[in-house]
Amino acid sequence: MIDFNEYKTYFDTYAARYDKADGRVALKIVHTYAVVSVMETLCRLRCLPPHTAGLALLCALFHDIGRFEQLKQYDTFLDHKSVDHASLSCKVLRENHVLDRLPETDREAVLTAIENHNKLRIDPTVTAAASSCPDDAQSLGAPGPCCSAGEVLELCRLIRDADKCDIFRVFATDDMTDVVGASEEEISRETITPEVMEALRKHASVDRRARKTHLDQWISFLCFVFDLNYRESIQIVKEQGYYKKPFARTDFKDPAAKALVREALEAVDLYMETFGETIPGALREFFQAPPKMA
């Protein structure tokens, strides 16, 4: 049985080493517990077995633990200007032996999910390993040597979804300079790179190498919707509505950019509508009284 509170205490102690007066540090602490909250909801709604749910919560708690050292060393959260933060998170966990009490297969499953949480797509070897299992071993908790591969893939999907769900909240409510490195006033004068808009039209994630402007990053956030794996995740994003708010409060100066923003929002709305109109009762209850983030 995984003692989540023990790991939570470790995270709190580790994060306390860094300067909370820096809004970016506080942002990541709040984000971590918000992702944990979303993960709890996804696990409950998907009726995951306790073992898988326990590992999923560890993925949520530690997925961004490398962010603190990234900020300390490079003074930025931008991976392309510093280091891959998922890889750094895994390095921190390994070097500090944080997960050593877990069985090796569980430890490696958590690390694999964390390593994959920020990538453009899940490592094909992870997907291939799961798909090579017999159908009767695909269900989580099923006996046999193949079920662990299916569980690893499930953990990858869960942490990618939970992280993206809360990134929309961060996008809408935190200081934009902390989030993307530019103010909303600066972004209002920017344009959207054609390659970024093309990715959105194809319902694809945006390769960070294609981004040229901060507004490109905003569009990249919208494209997260297309990479969500579960209907429950789509409904969380749709119901909270955070994805729209920065666009709604920004007066874009360039007419072409304004038109493209409108097109992008309409495309995302239409995509989410295809996942159905009915919000499950348990999910409605979550929105009425969301769990505490810390």
What do these predicted ranges mean?
Residues F4-K8, R107, V152:
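Alpha-helix initiation and N-capping motif
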Residues F68-A109, E115, K119-R121, G144:
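Hydrophobic/aromatic-rich structural module bridging two neighboring secondary-structure elements via a short loop
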